[in-house]
Each structure stands twice: as structure tokens, then as C-alpha cells.
């Protein structure tokens, strides 16, 4: 079974930001080490959307160029119908159990990302989500703080 790391918007935003603080530099080094060690790292479409919309809003052309470069270098996981059907199921279960991860009217990126991981897990893949938001994602998927993914 192959292992794949899905980048959530938090780490993806840090590695695509050309203006770095110490945490972002640490995240860039972490990502490079994953790639050098042969781990498959994938950018989920929903994480790309979350980071891209903010870069576009802020007119961050260098950040967009870096995001596009990462997208070309790493794997990319498009949102599929199967993932959206699973996301709807996750959304309903989370709300019915009193543990929503977003406002009822919001597009819940966390459940979409967790659903993408669940769909990947149905095959020969063992996905782990590298995130800054383990609390919400960890309810629905194998989600770990990005520093803990190796």
C-alpha cells in the first residue's frame, strides 16, 4: 500500500508564500525532505482553491507563480464526483453528531478534503493529511500536524 501526503491549505499556503517567516521556512524544508525521501505529496484541488483565492485577492503574483510551480512539481488531486458525494455524507454526519467544522451555510473545505482522502483510501493508497487544523480534520480522516508527517 503506497502512502500519499495531502497538503491542506495551511502548509500549502506557507510553502507557496515567497515572503517567509521562520515557520514557513521550516515548512518548506519539511516539504523538500518529504520529496527527497520519495514520499508522494499531492495538492488537493480544494486546498489549491483556498490558497489561490487568497493570493488572487491580495494580488500576490509571486505566490501564484510559486503555487503553480508546486502544482506542476507535485501530484494534484482533482475533486471528483465520488469525493463530493462522500463530502456530503461527512457534512451530514458531522452536523448530526454536533461536530460541524464550518458554518451551515459555508462551503466546508475540511469535509471536502477529508472526502478526497477517503476516496483515495478506497484504492491502494494510504492517505495522510498534513495540516495546521488537526482538530476538525482529524474527526473524519487521518490528519496530522504537518510537522508530524514523515
Q: Could you describe each region identified by the protein language model?
A:
Residues 17-23, 99-106:
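Short, flexible/disordered intra-domain loops and linkers
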Residues 1-43, 53-69:
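Short, well-structured N-terminal submotif of metal-dependent ribonuclease cores
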Residues 43, 78, 108, 131-132:
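Short beta-strand scaffold positions
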Residues 21, 32-37, 94-99, 118-126, ...:
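Alpha-helix termini
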Residues 137-143:
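Short loop/helix-cap segments at secondary-structure boundaries that form the rim of catalytic
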Residues 12, 48-51, 84, 137:
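A generic structural signal for short hydrophobic patches within well-formed alpha-helices
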Amino acid at each position: 500500500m503506497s502512502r500519499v501526503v495531502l497538503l491542506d491549505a495551511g502548509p500549502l499556503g506557507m510553502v507557496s508564500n515567497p515572503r517567509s517567516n521562520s515557520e514557513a521556512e521550516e515548512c518548506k524544508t519539511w516539504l523538500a525532505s518529504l520529496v527527497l525521501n520519495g514520499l508522494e505529496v499531492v495538492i488537493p484541488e480544494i486546498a489549491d482553491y483556498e490558497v489561490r483565492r487568497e493570493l488572487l485577492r491580495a494580488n500576490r503574483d509571486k505566490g501564484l507563480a510559486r503555487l503553480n510551480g508546486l502544482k506542476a512539481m507535485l501530484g494534484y488531486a482533482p475533486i471528483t464526483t465520488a469525493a463530493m458525494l462522500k463530502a456530503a455524507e461527512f457534512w451530514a454526519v458531522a452536523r448530526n453528531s454536533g461536530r460541524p467544522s464550518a458554518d451551515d451555510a459555508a462551503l466546508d473545505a475540511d469535509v471536502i478534503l477529508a472526502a478526497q482522502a477517503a476516496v483515495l483510501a478506497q484504492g491502494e493508497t494510504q492517505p495522510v493529511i498534513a495540516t495546521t487544523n488537526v482538530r476538525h480534520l482529524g474527526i473524519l480522516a487521518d490528519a496530522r500536524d504537518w510537522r508530524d508527517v514523515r
